[in-house]
Amino acid sequence: MERMEKKIYEFTNDGNSCVIYDAKPPRYWFNYLWNENGYCAQVSQNGHGRSYYLNERADMCMINNNDARYFYIRDDEMNKSWNIGAAPLNEQVESYQCEHSIGFSRLQSECQGIESSWRIFVPQTGFQEVWTFRLRNKSD
C-alpha cells in the first residue's frame, strides 16, 4: 500500500501565491513585503518576523528585531488560548494555512469553532505594516 504524504505547501494555479498547510515545516518560510520608501517586513508562516528599513545604499536599519508579531485568542468557556499561526503557544488547531503572496501574507486557522484570519501587508509608501484581523464564531 502506498503511503499518503501530507502536503506541506503548494503554489496557486496563477503562481502568485505559495500556500503553506503545515504550521511547523522543517524550516521557516518567509515572505518579504516592502515598499518604495525602503520599509521591509519579514513574515514567517507563523506571522513572526523582523521589520527594517533599507536606505538607497542598501544599509539596513532594524526597526523590530524581536520577531514578535503575534495575536492571542482565548475562549474563556473552554479555558483555552491559541494563536492563528500556532506560535508561540503551539496549541493544536483544527485547520491551518498561510498564504504568502505578492504584496501580502495571510494566516488562517480554526480552533474551538472559531475561524480566524490575519492579513499583513506594507502600504506602497510610509514606514508601517497594516494588519487586518477577522474572527468568526461558527459554534452555537
Identify the residue ranges that each predicted region occupies.
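Anionic coordination/interaction segments
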Residues: 1-140
